[in-house]
């Protein structure tokens, strides 16, 4: 049996398929969710997310900008502000964002709300760059 995985962003449904396992990083660490998992509600960290579907040897790798996870016996719902498959990451754009944010943060005189917002943006960009440079092969659809 497989788990129905639904990933929703502000732009709509990002992913809605049956999967063998989805691996996420929660505040409590890495967890793998499969069909029959105990009910769970948790936050998801800015991290790498792995999806393994039947017929794929390798995991689909995603960059996720944090979110919420709600698991029932046969279904997992993830709500996130942003997620993208590894192969869809625009590396040049991410590098430009990284350089821009590093410059802004290094020139900040005080740690106000803008500083912390930019620091969070930088964590998200670093995650995208790390995932895009990861040598793990992810299958194309």
Swiss-Prot record:
Transport is among the record's keywords: yes
Keyword terms, alphabetized: ATP synthesis, Cell membrane, CF(1), Hydrogen ion transport, Ion transport, Membrane, Transport
Gene3D superfamilies: F0F1 ATP synthase delta/epsilon subunit, N-terminal (2.60.15.10)
Annotated Gene Ontology cellular component terms: plasma membrane; proton-transporting ATP synthase complex
Subcellular location: Cell membrane
Its membrane topology: Peripheral membrane protein
GO molecular function: ATP binding; proton-transporting ATP synthase activity, rotational mechanism
InterPro entries in UniProt: ATP_synth_F1_dsu/esu, ATP_synth_F1_dsu/esu_N, ATPsynth_dsu/esu_N
One Pfam match: ATP-synt_DE_N
Function: Produces ATP from ADP in the presence of a proton gradient across the membrane.
Quaternary data: F-type ATPases have 2 components, CF(1) - the catalytic core - and CF(0) - the membrane proton channel. CF(1) has five subunits: alpha(3), beta(3), gamma(1), delta(1), epsilon(1). CF(0) has three main subunits: a, b and c.
Family: Belongs to the ATPase epsilon chain family.
Name this polypeptide is given: ATP synthase epsilon chain
Organism: Mycoplasmopsis pulmonis (strain UAB CTIP)
